Amino acid sequence: LPLYRQSIDWEWYERQYSPPDVFAKTVYTWPAERIREMQSERFLSVVAQGWQNQFYSARWREAGLAPDDIRSLDDITRLPLFDSDDIKKSLERDPPYGDFHGVNSSHMQATPFKLQTSGGTTGLPRGTLSEPIAWETQALAGARAMYVQGARPGDVMQIPMTCSLANAPWLAYKACHDYLGVLPLTTGTGVVTATRQQLEFAFRYGTNLWTSFPEYLLRLASACETELDRDVRELNTKFIRSFLGPDLDGALRAELQERWGCPIYDTYGTHEVGTAGFECTHQTGMHLMEDCVYLE
């Protein structure tokens, strides 16, 4: 059987992708030159894998490229782009998973995979298969961000998002449980655990961290007053990890921080890569997970 715990060389993995406390003292503080050297090495490794994948290699050959043409990260602009429409065509061409994964039935039988999907805003949600290293790295990236923001062993993080085909709640759970020593309180959405009960659980178990969407955080703060006759600030929350994309003028963050009495940190990610960018305690912009992603 393809046992998950045997699917990764864990000592190798930790050398490649440092755990949160080590990351905060190494990659997170490295100078740009050292980051660039590491990224170039990893980029070439990924490109070599891409040449073994029909979806990528066909596109690259159509663009007139050969394997020897890509020699460093400086050559990334020579690689043709693809978009969600190309992924949809891949799914239609080779259902149900598409050929962009480079996965066949023998891989599926020998390796544990996790399926997550997009939100489906432009059509049927697109599925992405994550093999163990990709799945772990998504969770680890979230854990690193939380550690930099102040999460520590013994904290309790409430996750009022349902573990479904969306990856955010799964990764928050794994980040806490597998990499931080933080207790994940997986209450799910209000459909699973009513808002009043969410708050009752929070007070009972000492929730001091949250991962949630801003709109529901406002709902929780209001319900705490109207249904429990309490102030949500009584929870003494250390910080909240949220997703503030629509908050262009900062008004929503300001309201949330006032009502909760704690910092609200923005997060950027996708269902394909997990946490790509995060805010630190200074809240002056995004840090990138630079040993995992590259921003052009």
Regions found by a protein language model. Name each.
Residues 1-34, 41, 45-48, 181-296:
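Active-site glycine/GP-rich loop and adjacent strand/helix microenvironment
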Residues 1-117, 124-137, 148, 204, ...:
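Nucleotide 5′-phosphate-binding alpha/beta core
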Residues 50, 117-121, 157, 210, ...:
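Conserved S/T- and glycine-rich ATP-binding loop of Class I adenylate-forming
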Residues 74, 138-156, 193-206:
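Conserved ATP-dependent adenylate/AMP-binding module captured primarily in the ANL superfamily
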Residues 112, 135, 162-166, 215:
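Short glycine-enriched loops at secondary-structure junctions
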Residues 116, 174, 254:
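Active-site phosphate/pyrophosphate- and oxyanion-stabilizing loops and adjacent acidic/basic residues
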Residues 123-137, 175, 182-186, 206-215:
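Acidic/glycine-enriched edge-of-secondary-structure segments
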Residues 143-179:
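Conserved AMP-binding loop of ANL adenylate-forming enzymes
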